[in-house]
Every structure is written in C-alpha cells, then in structure tokens.
A protein has these predicted regions:
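A nucleotide-sugar donor-handling region in carbohydrate enzymes
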Residues: 4
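Solvent-exposed soluble domains appended to multi-pass membrane proteins
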Residues: 8-30, 34-290
C-alpha cells in the first residue's frame, strides 16, 4: 500500500511512545468477552434489501443495540470463508499470519500476564483450522469445542443452523463461574455457516414476486435470514443478561465475513450489489461486517 499523505514514521513512533505501558489497576480488571459471529452481516446495508420491512424487522434489535453501543463496520480481508483470518487478527492485532508453530504474542497473553483467565469456546470441531493447537500457541488456558463440551449441548451437524442459544448460555455460565475473577473469554459462533439451501425456505422474508429475483436466490436469502433472526435475538439477550448482573463486562460482537450466497456470488450479482473492490464503495460492500 502507498504511504498515507502526511505520514511521518518518526512522528508516529514518538506518538506511540507517548502512551504509557502500564498494568491494569487491580480494581479495574473487568471481564472482557469477545464473540465473532459466523458469516454475520447486515443485509440492510444494501439498498436492494433495505426496502423490505421483513428484512428490517430481522435486524431491528441489532440496530437498537448499535444505538446503545460503540458500533461501526469492520473491514476484513476475506469473503465467504477463511474465518480464522478475522479470528486471529482480532486476537493478535496482525492483519496477516503465517502458520503458527509456537508461542505467539497476542492479546490473550496480554490478559493472562495481567492475571486474567483466558477461555475459548466454539461449538465446532477442534481440528478445523488446527484451532486447538493454535489456541495453545496464542495463550488460551482452556478451549472448549464439540469434542470436550459442546457435543453434549448441541449436535455438531445441527450446530451449523442452531447453536447460538447454547453458546450464549455457555458464555454466561462461564462468566458466573469466574465469580468476579478477571476473565477474558472469546467465542467463535457456528450458526449460519453456509451453504444455504436454494431448493426451499421456511420463512418468506423476500419473494420472487416482490423482488424480481429467482426463487433459488430468494430461498438462499430466506434461509440465511432465518438463522440471523435467531442470532440477533440471542446476542441481544446476552447483552440483557449481562446488564442484569452486577459484574461489569466489556462485550465485543463482530462478524467474520460476508455470507456465501451461491457460486460466484450469484445472489449478490442478481441483487445488483457492487463488488468492484477497485472502488471504495465496492471494497466496503465486499469486506465490511458489523
């Protein structure tokens, strides 16, 4: 990338050094909880879907949550897959990564050095992306996957479409078990993982008659929105449950990438979404998540 206009490396280093590197005071070691949401994006960002009241209703609780929070858009470097690029970027601050082969600097290790417990949760298999091993390298003290916990809570196949309730409940129980001790927890959801069926759908959020799009495209959108509708409500519930507790918590929710929508992004193409990444608008459309 080109050097930004007005950038001065020496001035940047001086500015960086002006921020003190201090430990978190004992009385301020509040819980920090991060949740990366599988294939989560706000489809009302696209004009093609923003005009549907049924779609707006899906995201209305999320929009209300955004109004109460610090919110915006995360620009990832992946589309419809490659989840761990966003995951490990969040945990390390590095925009790119090589294969992890040993102990690696991370925010996880920062928190454990400050006396926090560091827990990881994902209702999927530990071998996928070699997460179990990498989590050890990143500094997590405990990682719970399908094999050692979530398999008793939700069938791993069903988890692709319905597991946010179980994950939210697990995170709350883990927080309660900490009983006020400093805790950094990070979870990767599995619900809404693609692909989304194109042959049928349960709830008709959009239809060929109202949209002019093919039945197959509408089915994929409807099946995705059906899962997202539940996701939104589960994590709004999570925030409400946290608000009801005496223990303060910093909660960070974000999506890992845009959802897969047909081979070659066929659904996006049919909706007329601009994915020209040579333009700022197209780049944001392609990579931005809440």
């Amino acid at each position: 990338p080109e050097k930004p206009e007005g950038y001065d490396a020496r001035a940047a280093q001086t500015l960086l050094e002006s921020f003190p590197d201090e430990d978190i005071p004992e009385g301020e070691k509040i819980a920090v909880m991060g949740v990366m949401l599988e294939a989560f994006c706000d489809l009302t960002d696209f004009d093609a879907l923003a005009g549907f009241d049924t779609v707006q209703e899906v995201y209305a609780p999320w929009h209300a949550l955004e109004e109460q929070s610090l919110s915006g858009r995360l620009l990832t470097n992946i589309f419809a897959g490659g989840t761990v690029d966003t995951e490990w970027g969040f945990l390390t601050g590095a925009s790119e990564h090589d294969e992890y082969r040993g102990a690696t600097g991370s925010y996880v290790r920062y928190f454990t050095a400050q006396g926090y417990a560091a827990h990881y949760a994902h209702p999927g298999y530990s071998w996928f992306y070699d997460r179990e091993r990498v989590n050890d390298y990143l500094g997590f003290e405990r990682s719970v996957f399908t094999e050692n916990g979530f398999g008793e809570l939700v069938d791993p196949y069903v988890a692709m479409w319905h597991s946010d309730q179980q994950l939210a409940d697990y995170l709350l129980a883990d927080l309660d078990a900490a009983d006020g001790s400093p805790l950094f927890s990070f979870a990767v959801s599995y619900q809404n993982h693609g692909p989304y069926a194109e042959t049928e759908s349960t709830v008709p959020y959009v239809s060929p008659e109202a949209s002019g799009w093919s039945q197959e495209s509408c089915n994929m959108l409807n099946n995705y929105l059906f899962g997202v509708n539940e996701t939104v409500r589960e994590y709004v519930r999570l925030t409400q449950e946290l608000d009801a507790r005496d223990t303060p918590v910093v909660l960070v929710l974000f999506g890992d990438h845009k959802p897969w929508m047909g081979n070659g992004g066929s659904v996006y193409e049919e909706m007329g979404i601009d994915f020209d990444t040579s333009t700022l608008a197209g780049f944001r459309n392609y990579y931005a998540t809440p």
